[in-house]
Amino acid sequence: MRILNVSLLVLASSLVAFVECGRDFYKILGVAKNANANQIKKAYRKLAKELHPDRNQDDEMANEKFQDLSSAYEVLSDKEKRAMYDRHGEEGVAKMGGGGGGGHDPFSSFFGDFFGGGGGHGGEEGTPKGADVTIDLFVTLEEVYNGHFVEIKRKKAVYKQTSGTRQCNCRHEMRTEQMGQGRFQMFQVKVCDECPNVKLVQENKVLEVEVEVGADNGHQQIFHGEGEPHIEGDPGDLKFKIRIQKHPRFERKGDDLYTNVTISLQDALNGFEMEIQHLDGHIVKVQRDKVTWPGARLRKKDEGMPSLEDNNKKGMLVVTFDVEFPKTELSDEQKAQIIEILQQNTVKPKAYNGL
């Protein structure tokens, strides 16, 4: 009987723990429990693109999956909610009075334009729209290789309703006036509606711009409705244009990376082993057991930049070798030894255009 009571107690405790835990937000986002804020943001961004209902219209569960994803991010991206979730699960977060609902996507302005467009979000056709604002965002090659988030603090001009009324939606209409028997005159008049009065105020705004893995110069992140306001329409868009700063060791061409390495004449003749530290810190080993001439190139597959379209695909790393010759003068005996070793015929100097 005692064993039965213990078993029932264990079962009841398991059920209580299951109820308290609710959804596994770490599993939904596909991140470890010790994931940092940047890893959580990157995971959400990636899955939000894949699971967005607009891209999965044939999936009846699309809305539910996206709501779960939004709930997971809403909780795990907030330090206090995440700490509560880690201790008491989803039920503990609910008792805080917020988070975990997932009834909508609260992060559209956080991420800008999910689908890389740039048009269209100015409201109904014919609605006037404020000017777009384009800002150059200077980033490092490391940030493009690994992915990064940049916090932008700005003051945004917005129109707020105030007391009084104003003329709005003004347009020109043609009117006809009878001047006498059989005589008419047409003229143009300005006609306006009456709208609530507005005033222009400055609001503090914080945006987080994602530097996407594999993004190239000129790639844009678009935040719809964050541009210049329009007194009778919708605000324009805010566009961040990626500008990659020059790197001291690597040069990017498409998805390929290029770097130059200087080796000694001794290594050029005998072969060598060396290591190159990549943009994320991992080590690329380079080995040669043959003669390496100045300008020789070695290509390492899948060690270039990740593709923007598919981060699992990478270009090549192209290593160009420069050979440093010794600056000390050789003795006659050393020169004779080199001639003996190389057994190389004398090449007559020949001038040519090598460009």
Swiss-Prot record:
GO MF: misfolded protein binding; unfolded protein binding
The protein's name in its UniProt record: DnaJ homolog dnj-20
Alphabetically ordered keywords of this record: Chaperone, Signal
GO biological process per UniProt: protein folding; protein maturation
GO cellular component: endoplasmic reticulum
J domain residues: 24-89
PROSITE patterns the record matches: DNAJ_1, DNAJ_2
Signal peptide: 1-21
Highest taxon above the source species: Eukaryota
Pfam families attached to this UniProt entry: DnaJ (PF00226), DnaJ_C (PF01556)
